[in-house]
Regions:
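Histidine-dependent nucleotide/RNA phosphoesterase domain, centered on the 2H-phosphoesterase fold
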Residues: 2-245
């Protein structure tokens, strides 16, 4: 059973969708939340981050993004006039969970965490990346379904608690997404929303989650860069091999 998601004002959207399985419900929910944004913030103006800091995160990365990259670059070209910071080809990722600042997590804790995640109770799975919606600080793809991503987040969060790392937001506040461009200034949101809307008719792109990556994350030149500590394989299953239409 997947953990329940709660309304959380620090999350976006603050309330979860009515269904964690139904793509139409999730995509529409993301879009309606973005339509209600009046002002977008500078994504890089964030307390607790500087170019000198390093933090451990669980992410899903895309060494060979293929069709995802084609769809991303198509959308980025259509939004180029907005002057946002596009996510580069080698920077595409799905953020799953913060582990903690490098200076707050010992090498022994990292090794313990990796040992605990060698047999996660989550099988490999497929999701779809749907163009296009956004948040208060970014333009991003909606991901569907949420349920396997929520289960993965919960498993990683449980492992982190067992390893005694600082950890990140609880699973109840998790909102899966895939960012493709960051707002680099405060701006009126309606112009961004209007530019995004025509891209919503593009078909979704299938993504295959067969690994989860523990990375050392940093900010560099208004983008995110990372060093992969280890890619942890997710066990295969008959269900995970079922292709999504």
């Amino acid at each position: 059973m997947s953990p329940e998601l709660d309304t959380d004002p620090s999350a976006f959207p603050s309330a979860p969708p009515a269904s964690l399985d139904d793509p139409e419900v999730i995509v529409e929910h993301d879009w309606r939340a973005f339509q209600r944004v009046e002002r977008m913030a500078d994504h890089w103006d964030r307390p607790g981050w500087s170019d000198r800091q390093r933090k451990y995160y669980w992410m899903h990365t895309f060494p060979d993004p293929g069709q995802l990259l084609q769809r991303t670059e198509h959308c980025q070209r259509a939004l180029q006039h907005l002057g946002m910071d596009p996510v580069p080809a080698d920077g595409l990722h799905v953020t799953l969970l913060r582990v903690g600042a490098v200076d707050q997590v010992s090498t022994a804790q990292v090794e313990h965490l990796l040992d605990l995640t060698q047999e996660l109770p989550v099988s490999a799975f497929h999701v779809l990346a749907h163009p296009l919606a956004g948040s208060r600080g970014a333009v991003r793809f909606s991901l569907t379904p949420w349920k396997p991503l929520v289960r993965l987040h919960a498993a990683l969060h449980a492992a982190g608690k067992q390893a005694g790392v600082p950890g990140g937001a609880p699973t109840t506040a998790f909102r899966p997404h895939l960012g493709i461009a960051y707002s680099n200034q405060e701006r009126s949101a309606p112009a961004v929303i209007d530019a995004v809307e025509p891209l919503r008719s593009l078909p979704p792109v299938p993504l295959h989650f067969t690994t989860v990556d523990l990375v050392e994350l940093r900010r560099q030149d208004r983008t995110y860069r990372w060093r992969t500590i280890r890619s942890v394989p997710l066990p295969s299953s008959a269900t995970s091999r079922t292709a999504l239409a």
